[in-house]
Amino acid sequence: ETNKKGRTRKDHGAEKRLVVAGFRVVDRGIHAPYTHIPMSESATMDVSDLVKEMGKRAQNAARELAILSTDQKNAALGTLADLLLERSDLILAENRKDLQRAEKNGISGALYDRLKLTPERIRNMAEGVRDVISLPDPVGEEIERLKPRAGLDIRKVRVPLGVVGIIYESRPNVTIDCAILCLKSGNATLLRG
């Protein structure tokens, strides 16, 4: 399949191989070949080197995300919504560990509540993903067209930014919200929450 820029795009199916916000969905598991840096490696890296490396990997992911079709992005989002529900027990178990660490570190009650996931919150997150699927794809949308002189045709078209960095605190649902909006708009994202 060829996109608007004439680049060839391989469609391996959402559940086989699809780049998703810097991650690959492979047989319904998520792997991060672009942005993921193993803990053993990141523990020995200087913070500025770590951030630079993550940025490089995100830029590589951004190139692939920018050329995904609407169907590919929506399929990936659908897979994410399904996985949130299918793996909610695992997500809740990991969240309990986060909550225990937060308590040991003396987190405030308000931050604790924001960090805490419940089955209902996970269902709401999955529903939010499905809501984004129903939104029109902004990539390639013509937002303005001018013909000032004979032969000139000027168009303003929405394109992905590339890599979006977002910093927030203690909100697992914000992780999903940011990732899905960046994916829908064809952008890679670096999240710090």
Question: Which stretches of residues belong to each language-model region?
Answer:
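Short hydrophobic alpha-helical segments enriched in small aliphatic residues
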Residues: 13, 32-37
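Short, strongly patterned local motifs
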Residues: 25-27
